[in-house]
Amino acid sequence: MHAADVSGLQRNVVFDSYTPLSGGVQLTQRLLSPLMAMRVQRAIAALARTPPDQAVDLTREKFVLYVPAAEPPQGYALMVFVPPWEEAKLPLGWASVLDRHGIIFVSAANSGNAANVLDRREPLALLAAYNVERHYRVDASRVYVGGFSGGARVALRLALGYPDLFHGALLNAGSDPIGDEQIPIPSAQLFREFQESTRLIYLTGKNDSFHLDQDLRSRRSMQEWCVEGVVTQTAPWIGHEVAEAAALDHALSALRAPIAPDPQKQACDSGVADAVLAKTREVQTLIANGKIEQARAALQMLDARYGGLASPRSLELADKLNVH
C-alpha cells in the first residue's frame, strides 16, 4: 500500500508489511494461558517441518479503509474493526462520525464469525493496525480495537492481550467474562497495563436482552479483576444491530476520556494476588502429599483462572508434574 495522501473510503486495499505482534509466537504468548501456550509450542517443535510464524498471507487479503479528510493536529486515531460478517465494509452512517473524531477505520474481509480466531481474525486485526500506522500519522495513544457481536468478543481478547497497542475497545453488542480458558489473563505486566490504561466501552441496544446480559456478566468480571476503565452505554430503540451514528458518537467520545483512578484498586489487586498464591500453594501441598492427579487437576484450574498471573510458578509446577 502506498496511499498516505489518500482519504475517504477505499475498498479492496492490500497491505504488504508484517509485524512480530501478529506472528504465532506472540499470539500464543499473549492470547493463550501459559500451559496452553506451552503445549502449542511443544507441538510445533515436534513437527518435522516448522510452520511459518505468520499464518496470514497478505497478498491474498483485502481490507476496507476509511480515512477522514482532515488530519487532527496530534495525528489520526485508529479503529481496527473485527466484523461478524465476511464482507469488508464500513457500517452505514459511521463515516461522518469518524470524520468528527478524526478516526481512521480499517477492517479485514473474510474475518467474520466463521473464520478461525487465532489463525485469521486476530492476526488480520493486528496486521491492519500495523500497516495503517506505517502509512498514516497515527496518535499511538488513540489506537482502538472494536467489533460487533462475535467480532466484539474477539476485540475484547485483543484488547486484553495487546494493551500496549490497543488503548481502548468498543464492544458493540458482544462481550465475555475474562479469566477462563477462552479469555485467559495475560502476563502481569500486560494485565496491569490493561487494567489501568484501557478503556472498555460496552454499547448494546436497549432491546438486545441476551447481549445486555452478556455485558453484565463481562462487567462483573472486570470488577472482580480490578479493571478501571469500564463504561456502559445503551443504544435506545434498537435490538441486536450495529450502532447508529449518535450512539457511536457517544461511544467514541467515551473512548477518549481519561480513566479516573479507583481508590479501591490497590486492595482489589492485593485480593487477586492472595488468591493466586493460595491456589498455587494448594497445588504444592497436593504434590507434597503425593496426590499427583489431584495436583494436576488443580494446576489446570490455576492456569485457566489466573493465566499469566500464576506464571512462571505454574510452568515450574507443570514440569514437576510432567504435564504435557
Q: How would you label these PLM feature ranges?
A:
Residues 74-85:
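Short beta-strand element of the alpha/beta-hydrolase
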Residues 174-252:
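The feature captures the conserved acid-bearing segment of alpha/beta-hydrolase catalytic domains
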Residues 89-108:
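Short amphipathic alpha-helix adjacent to the substrate-entry channel of hydrolases
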Residues 1-76, 279, 283, 295-298, ...:
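A domain-start/cap signature at the N-terminus of enzymes
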Residues 87, 141-195:
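Primarily recognizes the serine-hydrolase "nucleophile elbow" in alpha/beta-hydrolase
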Residues 80-82, 172, 235:
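Alpha/beta-hydrolase
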Residues 68-75, 113-150, 165:
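Gly/Ser-rich "nucleophile elbow"/oxyanion-hole loop immediately N-terminal to the catalytic nucleophile
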Residues 1-12, 60, 225-229, 246-324:
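Alpha/beta-hydrolase-fold serine-hydrolase catalytic core, especially in secreted/extracellular enzymes
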